[in-house]
Design a protein with these regions (language model features):
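Intrinsically disordered, low-complexity regions enriched in Ser/Pro/Gly/Gln/His and often acidic
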Residues: 1-2, 86
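N-terminal alpha-helical modules
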Residues: 30-140
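Positively charged n-region of N-terminal signal peptides that target proteins for export
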Residues: 2-4, 9-15
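Intrinsically disordered, low-complexity regions
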Residues: 9, 21, 46-49
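Bacterial N-terminal signal peptides
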Residues: 18-26
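Hydrophobic alpha-helical context, especially transmembrane and signal-peptide helices
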Residues: 14-18, 118
Length: 140
């Protein structure tokens, strides 16, 4: 095995460990954290990068939908005079997430795409978790 594959194996292990930790601390009694479909999908990937990417892409779409859903009660809970600021803050966060996760790699390949989608998925999930925790509402 060459050095690049060994390094990528370590990076992949770190990604999976981070996802596991997020899942453990998000509380499975709530709808917070990764979806059950995502967890099942990841178990079936056999560590094949294209399959991992497909699972993460589906989960990112699910977390984006969840973020939109949980933002509404979060916004409604804010005092009327602060709702404009809450919307602005949310838009700034979306732009920051996209800037962080969509940075242009020197070399674009399957590994960098996996890192990009993992970043988008994790940041979106974490923000949706925060909105849920602050409103006390649980998305279904």
């Amino acid at each position: 095995m060459n050095e690049e594959n060994l390094l990528w194996g370590k990076e992949l292990k770190q990604i999976f460990t981070a996802l596991l930790v997020v899942g453990l601390f998000s509380g499975s009694a709530y709808a917070m954290g990764p979806t059950k479909k995502y967890e099942a999908c990841m178990k079936q990937t056999g560590n094949v990068l294209s399959e991992i990417d497909a699972c993460m892409s589906k989960e990112y779409k699910a977390q984006k939908k969840r973020l939109k859903k949980v933002f509404k009660p979060y916004l409604a809970k804010a005092p009327a005079e602060e709702q404009g600021l809450v919307k602005q803050s949310h838009q700034q966060w979306l732009a920051q997430r996209d800037q962080i996760c969509n940075n242009k790699p020197i070399v674009k390949n399957e590994k960098t795409e996996l890192q990009r989608i993992s970043c988008l998925m994790q940041m979106t999930q974490t923000r949706a978790d925060m909105y849920e925790a602050r409103t006390g509402r649980i998305s279904k």
